[in-house]
């Protein structure tokens, strides 16, 4: 072997070693970028530099950037918390059951996350799903008061966002199916109507009744949120079907969000958890598409956090998919969010199950975060 051949082989071996050193979370994004860089080189020569210097790229952890995060339960294990740190996450959404959402317990949970350098960006207290609240039943004031205390406690802890939804009697899925070899949730509207649907409560509830219940709830909790400086982030109805199990659903269209915004008035503490997957499920029936929603609410600072999920196609049937495996162009989504200056948290949503995955599904989670990180870095290069 000639001296030049040895030099070329040595450079290639060095490149492979450097690629293998990439952390798991950056493998899918940074690794492919590095291989693309090597591919620009002719055999035995150094890679050619970019023809023009690129603009400075926003650091991933800059406060002005999108905050990659994950949604987890308050009882997450120490190993799972360490895993989140290992894949480079510094933010999380934490979900509390009503009996877990005390100030003492939330303080303990926050300290556990802080020990791994992870901040809690948003929190959920599932007391908001109380049928008394969401159906406007007698006794709801006690549950609403519990939610008000929760908001005050988030303010004391410096947790800036409270996520919630408003869809009593919901059915998320009709089957678990295989897609590209992984396990994912399917919703088939025809199957739901024929096989799954049944009246959930003692009677049916109209859209007017659910609007009355939502208005009562928001009027009661929004002042507490404003006083605590905590933002209320409303998730759309998933799936966006107008009525399920005998109860109307009101956040299945752009008009529903606009009406909810009117209920909240000019408050800066009311906004959206914008679930990209849910909006993609609805397709044309949503009134505005994903990108129009981002421009409408995002430009006005009304998107507080984002659930980043793709689906196989719109209703009447869809399968939840990894971000690279659905019909929506997720790079366009990421770029659109950067263009409107979104700087909230972004979490993978309903992570599909890869072989051997359990708990928080670390393999699937790492896959999603790596893909999202790659899209975000590219969007930052283009947007600045």
Regions inferred by a protein language model and the residue ranges of each:
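Gly/Pro-rich active-site loop or hairpin
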Residues: 97-98, 243-258, 263, 278-343, ...
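Short, acidic/polar
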Residues: 73-84, 144-151, 289-294
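Structural preference for beta-strand elements that scaffold enzyme active sites
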Residues: 65-69, 91-93, 119-121, 160-163, ...
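Active-site acidic/histidine proton-transfer and metal-coordination neighborhood
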Residues: 23-25, 31-35, 134-271
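Conserved, mostly hydrophobic/aromatic
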Residues: 92, 154, 235, 306, ...
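N-terminal secretory signal peptides
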Residues: 1-15
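Acidic (Asp/Glu)-rich catalytic clusters
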Residues: 81-88, 104-121, 155, 223-227, ...
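C-terminal segment of N-terminal export signals and the immediately downstream linker at the start
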Residues: 13, 34-71
């Amino acid at each position: 072997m000639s001296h030049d051949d040895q030099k070329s082989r040595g450079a290639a071996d060095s490149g492979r070693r450097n690629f293998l050193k990439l952390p798991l979370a950056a493998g899918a994004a940074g690794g492919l970028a590095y291989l693309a860089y090597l591919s620009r080189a002719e055999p035995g020569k150094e890679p050619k530099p970019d023809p023009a210097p690129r603009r400075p790229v926003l650091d991933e952890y800059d406060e002005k950037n999108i905050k990659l995060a994950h949604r987890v339960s308050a009882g997450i294990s120490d190993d799972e918390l360490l895993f989140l740190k290992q894949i480079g996450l510094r933010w999380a959404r934490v979900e509390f059951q009503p009996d877990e959402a005390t100030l003492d317990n939330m303080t303990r949970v926050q300290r556990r996350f802080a020990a791994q350098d992870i901040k809690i960006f948003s929190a959920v207290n599932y007391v908001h799903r109380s049928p008394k609240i969401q159906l406007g039943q007698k006794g709801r004031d006690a549950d609403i008061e519990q939610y008000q205390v929760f908001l005050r406690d988030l303010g004391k802890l410096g947790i800036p966002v409270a996520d919630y939804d408003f869809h009593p009697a919901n059915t998320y899925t009709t089957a678990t199916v295989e897609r590209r070899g992984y396990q994912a949730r399917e919703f088939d509207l025809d199957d739901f109507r024929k096989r799954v649907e049944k009246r959930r409560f003692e009677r049916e509830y109209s859209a007017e009744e659910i609007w009355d219940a939502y208005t009562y709830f928001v009027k009661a909790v929004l002042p507490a949120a404003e006083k605590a400086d905590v933002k209320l982030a409303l998730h759309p109805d998933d799936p966006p079907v107008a009525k399920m199990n005998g109860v109307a659903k009101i956040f299945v269209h752009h008009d529903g969000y606009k009406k909810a915004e009117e209920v909240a008035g000019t408050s800066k503490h009311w906004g959206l958890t914008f679930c990209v997957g849910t909006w993609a499920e609805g397709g044309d029936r949503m009134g505005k598409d994903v990108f129009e929603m981002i421009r409408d609410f995002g430009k006005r600072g009304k998107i507080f956090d984002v659930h980043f999920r793709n689906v196989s196609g719109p209703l009447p049937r869809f399968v939840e998919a990894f971000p690279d495996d659905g019909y929506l162009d997720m790079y366009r989504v990421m770029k659109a969010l950067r263009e409107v200056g979104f700087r909230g948290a972004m979490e993978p949503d309903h992570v599909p199950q890869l072989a051997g995955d359990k708990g928080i599904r670390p393999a699937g989670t790492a896959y999603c975060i790596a893909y999202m990180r790659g899209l975000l870095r590219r969007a930052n290069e283009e947007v600045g």
